[in-house]
């Protein structure tokens, strides 16, 4: 039987947008934790024991509780300490934040996956992966234009960052980097500036450092 960790343990993968949003909340909250970088093709047994579904992020708390949904990890960290007031955007009700995040995690994520990884969907692409990818890129444009409009005060929910921004930005980053030249040419100046400011921020830089893959035999836990 494994001893419970002294600190919360985060199983993460650097480029995963779900893991990235969890790391952002943990970083802004200042909540101490142990970072365990995962190789997705060789997931550690300890992570799978904690969360059999096998996706990152997973946060194992010192009392044994497991959080394996990225938004739950964000809310847990921010409930403990929310110095930037991400949970209290100035101009909106909580349900508006939830609706915006749901739009990102639903239809937009579906289009993002098929744009970035068209070869994963041979049954849907009809043998034309390139055309299939462009079809889903086009299908995502309405959502991106909506975000561009909503950013008229600089952030999605007003004049400062909120949970919605930090939950959604990692996915916009992934979309933009799929074809950076195309993205830069689109008529979304607010969206492009929002993403650029995020990627230039100290917070973003702090959560994007590279980690060696976690090796259980090298861990003290």
Stretch-by-stretch model annotation:
Residues 1-134:
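GST-like domain detector, emphasizing the conserved glutathione-binding G-site
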Residues 76, 178, 207:
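Residues that scaffold the ATP/ADP-binding catalytic core of kinase and kinase-like folds
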Residues 96-196:
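GST-like fold's C-terminal all-alpha helical module
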Residues 189-221:
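Long hydrophobic alpha-helical segments typical of transmembrane helices together
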């Amino acid at each position: 039987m494994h001893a419970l960790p002294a600190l919360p343990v985060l199983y993460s993968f650097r480029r995963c947008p779900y893991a990235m949003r969890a790391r952002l909340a943990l970083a802004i909250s200042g909540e101490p934790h142990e970072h365990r970088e995962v190789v997705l093709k060789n997931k550690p047994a300890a992570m799978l024991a904690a969360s059999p579904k096998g996706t990152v992020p997973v946060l194992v708390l010192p009392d044994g509780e497991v959080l394996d949904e990225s938004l739950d990890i964000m809310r847990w960290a921010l409930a403990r300490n929310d110095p930037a007031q991400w949970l209290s955007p100035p101009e909106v009700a909580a349900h508006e934040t939830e609706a915006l995040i749901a739009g990102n995690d639903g239809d937009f994520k579906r289009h993002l996956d098929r744009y970035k990884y068209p070869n994963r969907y041979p049954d849907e692409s009809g043998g034309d992966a390139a055309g299939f990818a462009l079809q889903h890129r086009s299908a995502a444009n309405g959502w991106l234009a909506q975000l561009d409009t909503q950013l008229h005060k600089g952030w999605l929910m007003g004049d400062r960052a909120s949970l919605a921004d930090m939950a959604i930005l990692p996915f916009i980053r992934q979309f933009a980097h799929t074809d950076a030249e195309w993205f830069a040419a689109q008529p979304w100046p607010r969206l492009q500036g929002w993403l650029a400011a995020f990627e230039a921020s100290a917070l973003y830089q702090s959560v994007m450092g590279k980690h060696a893959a976690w090796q259980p035999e090298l861990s003290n836990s």
